Amino acid sequence: MAAAVPGAVSLSPLLSVLLGLLLLSAPHGASGLHTKGALPLDTVTFYKVIPKSKFVLVKFDTQYPYGEKQDEFKRLAENSASSDDLLVAEVGISDYGDKLNMELSEKYKLDKESYPVFYLFRDGDFENPVPYSGAVKVGAIQRWLKGQGVYLGMPGCLPAYDALAGQFIEASSREARQAILKQGQDGLSGVKETDKKWASQYLKIMGKILDQGEDFPASELARISKLIENKMSEGKKEELQRSLNILTAFRKKGAEKEEL
């Protein structure tokens, strides 16, 4: 073991504190502070990473974002673990100093007054990302992603019934839809007791579409989205959020309209 340097013992605690402060104040990579569940990208890694996932949701924002919208993004990024097809990423942009990632800002004609800006890249297509222009709320973005064909394990949603909902909405005849509804009804016996309430809601929506037509999911989404803005208990609000999540399964893939 090397001999101790005179004075080193007394200086160690001070040096440790100073080093800790320096680490805390130093920028964490080119995109600013890292968000758990989101991959920070720059002008080099952006072009390497996007083609490697079927879906990549990229948030373009200031280098050091904060506030309510950033908190929503943090929740979204952590929840993205439920999807095997989706990668959540973020690009921090600065138009002063080193002007970080301005090349990407110019490429996608981003307005810093509109940050955060979200784009969904599909199958490595850099030129035609799908923009998101809805509310920066976890539930709203998740429902929009689901409408774009990204599977997310959202509260209230059941994978088997999500699949049936997709088949139902794409079916071209009333007879085919009735057959899918019956398939869902027959499958209820195999659903866990705790999930039967939500499975039944899928079936109820199918019945409403058969009775009232194609516009039912959209009108019901609008109705519940407006209702949820009212003052109510957290339990009731959570239940309505689950209903919104289930309704999203009945949107055709690629639908551009976002929910509130």
Swiss-Prot record:
Induction trigger: By stress.
Listed InterPro entries: ERp29 (IPR016855), ERp29_C (IPR011679), ERp29_C_sf (IPR036356), ERp29_N (IPR012883), Thioredoxin-like_sf (IPR036249)
Protein's name in the database: Endoplasmic reticulum resident protein 29
UniProt function note: Does not seem to be a disulfide isomerase. Plays an important role in the processing of secretory proteins within the endoplasmic reticulum (ER), possibly by participating in the folding of proteins in the ER.
GO molecular function, one term: protein-folding chaperone binding
Signal peptide coordinates: 1-32
Entry keyword Endoplasmic reticulum: yes
Motif interval(s): Prevents secretion from ER: 257-260
Tissues expressing this chain: Ubiquitous. Mostly expressed in secretory tissues.
Substitution effect: residue 157 to S: Loss of function
Keyword field contains Signal: yes
Domain of life: Eukaryota
Annotated GO biological process: intracellular protein transport; negative regulation of gene expression; negative regulation of protein secretion; positive regulation of gene expression; positive regulation of MAPK cascade; protein folding; protein secretion; regulation of endoplasmic reticulum stress-induced intrinsic apoptotic signaling pathway
Gene: Erp29
Keywords assigned by UniProt, alphabetized: Endoplasmic reticulum, Phosphoprotein, Signal, Stress response
Compartmental location: Endoplasmic reticulum lumen; Melanosome
Subunit text: Homodimer. Part of a large chaperone multiprotein complex comprising CABP1, DNAJB11, HSP90B1, HSPA5, HYOU, PDIA2, PDIA4, PPIB, SDF2L1, UGGT1 and very small amounts of ERP29, but not, or at very low levels, CALR nor CANX.
GO cellular component, one term: melanosome
Modified residues (Phosphotyrosine): 64, 66
